[in-house]
Structures are given as C-alpha cells and as structure tokens.
Amino acid sequence: MTFSLRFTADLIFALAARAITNKNGFPFILQLSPDTDFDTGAAALSASMPRVDNGSSQSSTLVPRYRSPILWISGSEPLDHPEVPRFTNALAASGRHVFLQTSGASLKRRLHEFQPSSRFYFAIHFDGLDPLPDRSSACDAPFRVGIEALRMARLAGFFTCAHLVVRPGAEDSKLEELHAEISKLDVDGFLLTRSALSPELERNVNRLRRRLLSRRWALLSDLVESVALPAASRNSRQTGRQPLSESQPDNFEEGAEAG
C-alpha cells in the first residue's frame, strides 16, 4: 500500500512543519466541517472565483482559499450536505490532498457526484466496531455499511482508506481482526487514531500503529489525530509533543508496505 510520489514528499515535509505553524500562517493539516465551514465559504468563493468549464456535469471548479496541503473533511456526516462533492472536487483540483471522512451510509447515492483524483481519498470511519459480530445482529449494520462503502469506492476508481478509531478498553486482537478483514478489500491504507487524550490509550495506539501501519500511514494518522481530537485534548497534546527523529524521512521511500 503506497502513496503517490507527491503525497510522500508532502508527508516528509510534515516532519519539519509539524512542530511549528507554517511560515505562511496556515497549518499543515486543516480540518473542515460542512456543518460550519462550507456554507459561509460557498458564496464568497462563487462570487470571487472564475468559472471553468471542465467538460463534466459540474459547471465550475472553485479554487479554494484554504492553503493547507492536507484537508481533512469531517463533521456529523459530510455526505448529508449537498455542496460537499463540489467543494471536495474543487479542493482536490486545486492541488490539496483531500480526505473525506464518512460512515459510508449515503455513499451509494452520492458517489457519482465525486471525481476520482490522486489527491482525493474516501476515509471510511470505523468507530469502536466489533469486526466479527453476529451476522444476524443489528450491531453488525455499521460494519457492513463501511465495508460496502469501501468496496463501492474502490470499484469506482477512488483512493480509499479505513479510519479506525480506538477507544479506551479496546482489545488489540479486535483491532487486528478488523484490520485483517478490511485488508481483504485491497484498500490504499489505514488511519489509526485514538478517541480521547489518555496516556494509556496513546501507548496502545502507538503500539498498534507500529504493528499494523507503514511509517507513512502512521505519520498521517498522527497528523489526523492532531485535528480530530477534541479541542482541549489537542491543546494539551501540542504542549507535550516531541519532534520525530530527523532520520525518519529516509524511511518514506515508495514501496509496498503493509497498512
């Protein structure tokens, strides 16, 4: 499972940029939510940006104001917002790496609105799910929805990753089973993040990353976690952040790595 050369280069750059704010005044990874960010930005972008005929059903491409190289789109459920596909396509076309987190429940009816791109990933969210529940149980529904969403997106030519959220008390064996089950779909990668600020949970997640993820996906998981954690947790986390070793960029060459 590999990244594109451009994405690999951007992740290497993250090793130098992660401890400080970018000199241009924007973070390396920016979290956006259609609940709060897209509605207010749409009017301004539509009024100020030229319309470009891209030969598709989408009448224009909006060049975004967001300068961060990686954009993480999340929220209650991004696919419930009608403007998300247009914004996502425009952000990816502008040169940003875009990750759209979704449960996958609405993906079947919205998939045709998105454009495959080497800069765009569907990040299917698996939060505290038992990977092998009783198949006759209702609790299996979210897991099956996520699996089907990954399968649909892959068949349609999109890059995909599974975002596994680790909660306190989660068993390593369960996460490993979930990772193995999803790996059968030949997804492009995995993100592994914790649900809350906890030293014990952090140790557990770091151990799982070393065991299950490549260095690139482990780094991206850490970057995503820095914006996905609750605000209070992020502030405390940044205070105690330790920089990665300068020797680590050498470990980010292209190659087939697990996770």
Feature roles, as predicted:
Residues 36, 48, 126-130, 194-196, ...:
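Short, histidine-centered active-site or binding-site loop motifs used for metal coordination
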Residues 1-25:
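Membrane-proximal basic amphipathic "stem/tether" segments
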Residues 18-58, 65:
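Canonical Radical SAM [4Fe-4S] cluster-binding loop centered on the CxxxCxxC motif
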Residues 59-73, 81-194:
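Radical SAM/AdoMet-radical enzyme domain recognition
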Residues 195-259:
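A C-terminal junction/extension of Radical SAM enzymes
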Residues 13-22, 31-35, 88-98:
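N-terminal/domain-start segments enriched in small and hydrophobic, helix-friendly residues
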Residues 41, 55, 83-84, 174-177, ...:
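Residues at alpha-helix caps and immediate loop-helix transition turns in enzyme cores, especially N-
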